[in-house]
Amino acid sequence: MEDGLAIGRTAIAIFGLLAFASLPAMTPGQEPDVAIRAGEHRIPFTVRDCAVYVHARVNGNRAILLLDTGAVLTTLSLKLVPTQQTDSRITVTMAKGSIVAFRVPVGFTLGESSEREEHYSFRQPAIVGDFKFGSADGVIGLDVLSSFESVTFDFKNAVIVLKSK
């Protein structure tokens, strides 16, 4: 009987080792979803009224910007970026009429964290005019978003993941 018990225990141990050995190994590319990879910036966002907003700085001023994948150009309000005299005057035709606007180089920082991976700074021309954005100060459009290799909205963790090209 003891021989049968020893064989049974040995068989269980062997099956356990085989089961453990057959588990897939975790490779370096399989870090948890919240791990920050090189070239990634994880910018916190909030959702209000089915829209995604990020805290930002525009020319050093605090701002709340709407992320709009349907907007071709990044557009800002005059109260956020008062324009200086510029020759880049344009007319923007909208559903409710036309607005005089200007194409102006602007300094942006998306995200307010001091952590390098949790904000992203860049310069980009933007359209500045007497636009109304509800509770936002401006819109980040595809001209900015398409400058990244990928843009992922992680709603579970409330971050937008910007992967540099």
Predicted region positions:
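N-terminal secretory signal peptides that target proteins for export/translocation
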Residues: 1-7
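Pepsin/retropepsin-fold aspartyl endopeptidases
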Residues: 2, 15-165
